[in-house]
Amino acid sequence: MEVRTFAFLQIVVFVALGIQLFAAVTDAADADDEFFTVDYCGMNCTLQQDGSWTPCTQKNAECKCYHESGSSVGLCLSTAYTDFNQFGDPNNSDLDAATPRHPDASSR
């Protein structure tokens, strides 16, 4: 009796794991339309005595100071988020219609 109960519980756990894995893979497949990048700017930032942080001066002010709460040292990071859903389908016929044509191509 105990063996059957244990086997049943193992099957339940494997089924639950399979469902979770399927959900994770499906969610990851949908994430192709979004792209988030973080780049280290090559410098750190520190908390000054007046409560302000030293500026991150790399990459034309694209870098910002990111720090954990309670910490007096942070990292200068550059972040970028791209949502590829904002761009149209590259196979859209409107793109072909809007493509510039060479002036001689219309006379042929």
Curated annotation (Swiss-Prot):
- Domain of life assignment: Eukaryota
Q: Which GO terms describe its cellular component?
A: extracellular region
**Keywords annotated in UniProt:** Disulfide bond, Glycoprotein, Secreted, Signal
Q: Which residues are glycosylated?
A: 44, 91
**In UniProt terms, what function does this protein have?**
Salivary chemokine-binding protein which binds to host chemokines CXCL1 and CXCL8.
Main location (coarse class): secreted
Q: What is this protein called?
A: Evasin P1229
Which classification does the entry list for the species? Answer: Eukaryota, Metazoa, Ecdysozoa, Arthropoda, Chelicerata
- Report disulfide bridges, numbered on this chain: 41-63, 45-65, 56-76
Q: Which residues form the signal peptide?
A: 1-31
Q: Compositionally biased, Basic and acidic residues: which spans? A: 99-108
Task: Please list where the region (Disordered) is annotated.
Answer: 88-108
What would be an example GO MF term here? C-X-C chemokine binding
Q: Where in the cell is it found?
A: Secreted
